[in-house]
Amino acid sequence: MGDAATDAGMDAVQKRLMFEDKCILVDENDNVVGHDTKYNCHLMEKIESENLLHRAFSVFLFNSKYELLLQQRSATKVTFPLVWTNTCCSHPLYRESELIKENALGARNAAQRKLLDELGIPAEDVPVDQFIPLGRILYKAPSDGKWGEHELDYLLFIVRDVNVNPNPDEVADIKYVTRDQLKELLRKADAGEEGLKLSPWFRLVVDNFLFKWWDHVEKGTMHEAADMKSIHKLI
């Protein structure tokens, strides 16, 4: 288990998820090699000593005006509390429906599940077949001295008008942004204004892919941008 003093201050909901959720362990080629608790997968000590790498997904949901839905992670999140990030970021779990690698179906099933859990978006608002996997990235990012991320992340894009009812255990705030509004958020984060922080995985996607992919979102040509054969190592 972890450090008792540190864990004692952990939010009860987050603590339960840390030990109940089983993440999918993969190698750097995205082959499944086992599973471990969410707790162990986010301990920097384990990440560094055992090179634990787990599968993840990041949803980028746009409305019909092609504005991107962002969320601010709740203050009780163990990793990266109160940072702004893309619509939803989480992990497929080690269960049959979320282990399916073909057409990224496992990640898409997990995305539908977590959009309901975090943002209250009903499954019928985000049909699994409407998620378009555009790519995969591999990255490592410490959150603080104890916690961090080491993920092979599926980037899932979807254009839908949805009903949003955020879960306060997961989400502190939400907003839709245009390209220009996102660029202003980036400027503020870089300048340290208003205490604004962005998640490291979101920033990697923004810096490497997002704005060119946004063109495809608006043109309805996302399939042309998709590259699920490559794994972009952004470490």
Curated annotation (Swiss-Prot):
Keywords assigned: Chlorophyll biosynthesis, Isomerase, Isoprene biosynthesis, Magnesium, Metal-binding, Photosynthesis
Biological process terms in GO annotation: chlorophyll biosynthetic process; dimethylallyl diphosphate biosynthetic process; isopentenyl diphosphate biosynthetic process; photosynthesis
Pathways per UniProt: Isoprenoid biosynthesis; dimethylallyl diphosphate biosynthesis; dimethylallyl diphosphate from isopentenyl diphosphate: step 1/1; Porphyrin-containing compound metabolism; chlorophyll biosynthesis
Residues bound to substrate: 38, 73, 77, 90
Positions annotated to bind Mg(2+): 42, 54, 149, 151
Catalytic residues (UniProt): 89, 151
GO cellular component, one term: cytoplasm
EC number: 5.3.3.2
Entry's cofactor comment: Binds 1 Mg(2+) ion per subunit.
Catalytic activity: isopentenyl diphosphate = dimethylallyl diphosphate
Residue intervals of the Nudix hydrolase domain: 52-204
Cofactor list: Mg(2+)
Any one Gene Ontology molecular-function term assigned to this protein's record: isopentenyl-diphosphate delta-isomerase activity
Function: Catalyzes the 1,3-allylic rearrangement of the homoallylic substrate isopentenyl (IPP) to its highly electrophilic allylic isomer, dimethylallyl diphosphate (DMAPP).
Entry similarity comment: Belongs to the IPP isomerase type 1 family.
Protein name: Isopentenyl-diphosphate Delta-isomerase I
Gene designation per UniProt: IPI1
